[in-house]
Amino acid sequence: MKLQNFKFHGSGLERFFGPLEARIMNALWDAPDELTIKEVQQTLNRDKEMSFNTVMTVMNRLVDKGILSKKSVSKSYRYRPVLSRDAFLEAQSKELTFELVQEFGSRAVAHMVDALEQVDPDLLDQLERHLKQLKKER
């Protein structure tokens, strides 16, 4: 999956989506089943009033981007994310890492290792085990 417009200064899903897109995606990921636009609107309205047309426009743009799928049921459409939240974040982090390494090479790798040490030394141990496994598989 192509990397969404990543924003370094955002947080959470807003690194990949606009604020309303992120709220819509969270509503759909948190739902046990597919939702209609009206159901998403009702979920969003708990926090902030949103017009039906605004929600519909954003959801259809997410369909156009390949993030959501929709299917016709009775007289309405039901929407769902193409990927689970975990699968989406996995794909995006993989693509981001690939692009950083492709663009910045060993500098990016060195900074990632430094970040692992600062943020969570256990992650550095996991990386070391992963590297050993990759070397065995060669």
Indicate residue ranges for each PLM-predicted region:
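Short alpha-helical segments that sit at the start of domains
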Residues: 1-26
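Short, cationic-aromatic polyanion-contact patches
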Residues: 16-20, 73-92
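Short acidic, hydrophobic short linear motifs in intrinsically disordered regions
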Residues: 34-43
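Short helix-coil junctions and helix-kink-helix linkers
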Residues: 42-50
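Short, hydrophobic-biased segments on the C-terminal half of alpha helices
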Residues: 56-60
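Glycine-centered, phosphate/nucleic-acid-interacting loop/turn motifs that mediate DNA/RNA or nucleotide
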Residues: 66
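Short beta-strand "wing" residues that participate in macromolecule-binding interfaces
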Residues: 70
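Amphipathic alpha-helical dimerization/coiled-coil segments
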Residues: 93-133
